[in-house]
Regions:
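Conserved CoA-thioester-binding segment of acyl-CoA-metabolizing enzymes
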Residues: 1-58, 95
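Hydrophobic, secondary-structure "cap" segments at the distal end of domains
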Residues: 151-162
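Hydrophobic/aromatic residues within transmembrane alpha-helices
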Residues: 57, 70, 119-120, 179
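Glycine- (often His-adjacent) and acidic-residue-rich active-site loop
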Residues: 59-93, 112, 142-144
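Glycine-rich beta-to-alpha active-site loop
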Residues: 91, 96-143, 147
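Helix-capping/helix-break motifs at membrane-protein junctions
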Residues: 79, 160, 190-191
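Amphipathic alpha-helical segments at domain termini/boundaries
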Residues: 2-22, 121, 168-273, 287-291
Length: 291
């Protein structure tokens, strides 16, 4: 079975569904409202289809999985209310993806940045292609904003706060082996092994860590009393390099995590914070420079 939408193509092979992103009339895959609307409909359809036992999301373009949100669209939104609505739309779609009862895999070829990585973080597994073009990161801070589709919540959950904050506050972009070393992706494979690896993970239920797991230190770093200590360290580093009056985004991201951690309510606060930052002169200037 193969079904096509405007921006997405679905291909079901037995009990596995391949979802290919190929944004219409665009050389790269970026995310706007129409992409999100289609993706929400697709995910809700998957949730109702009992014949689908695994989902693999990948790109049908050679330029990469997703380069992020459509910055031109964001720059055209004129009010905080409009930006908040767009941000919450993306959060809702990715939350639906994260809540699917089947294993979900992001097969990353080429660029996976910003909103693209946030989509991948909403999946159970991430596989990176062994390719010089494959890059991952959350570079929003370079545009005077911070991640807004769950990145400030899901990344600290996955990596622990120190590693996640370093990536969020610097906008660092990594090749797949560096990402795998951090725990951001589960496996790096050459192209010839990509399909086999994706199918393996899509048929594997996510491992549930026990309370005694050695990896529980990541959860510990997000506890409220630990957040204050970690925030103080990162704030000192920021003050040594960045004036908060001229460049407020990293301070806003750090404050957001310190106050709300990785609790579910942090998603709304993330959206509220981003919508304020996007209206600042710094963000408006950096987005103009981007084009």
């Amino acid at each position: 079975m193969q079904v096509s939408y405007l921006h997405w193509k679905l291909k079901q092979e037995k009990n596995m569904l391949w979802l290919y992103f190929d944004k219409k009339d665009s050389s790269t895959n970026n995310i706007d409202q129409s992409v999100l609307t289609e993706l929400m409909a697709i995910i809700r359809g998957i949730a109702k289809n009992k014949s689908i036992q695994g989902l693999i999301i990948t790109s049908d373009k050679t330029t990469g999985l997703i380069v992020g949100a459509d910055i031109q669209i964001i720059s055209q939104l004129k009010t905080k209310k409009e930006i908040l609505a767009f941000t919450r739309q993306g959060q809702s779609v990715f939350e639906e993806l994260a809540n699917l009862k089947i294993p979900t895999v992001a097969l990353i070829n080429g660029l996976c940045l910003g909103g693209g990585l946030e989509l991948a973080l909403a999946c159970d597994y991430r596989i990176g292609l062994e390719d010089n073009k494959t890059r991952l990161g959350l570079p929003e801070i370079m545009l005077g904003i911070h991640p807004g589709w769950g990145g400030t919540v899901r990344l600290p959950r996955l990596l622990g706060a120190p590693r996640a904050l370093e990536l969020i506050l610097t906008g660092r972009i990594m090749h797949p082996y560096a990402a795998a070393k951090l725990g951001l992706i589960d496996r790096v494979v050459p192209l010839r092994q990509a399909e086999r690896a994706a199918l393996y993970y899509a048929s594997t239920k996510p491992w549930k860590r026990t309370r005694f797991s050695a990896l529980n230190w990541r959860k510990l770093t997000n506890y409220s009393w630990v957040r204050n200590l970690i925030s103080a360290i990162f704030r000192r580093r920021l003050i040594a390099k960045i004036n908060p009056l001229h460049y407020p985004a990293p301070y806003a991201a750090l404050h957001l995590w310190q106050q709300y951690g990785v609790a579910h309510k942090a998603f709304l606060q993330e959206a509220e914070s981003l919508s304020k930052l996007a209206m600042t002169p710094t963000a408006e200037h950096l987005m103009r420079v981007f084009f």
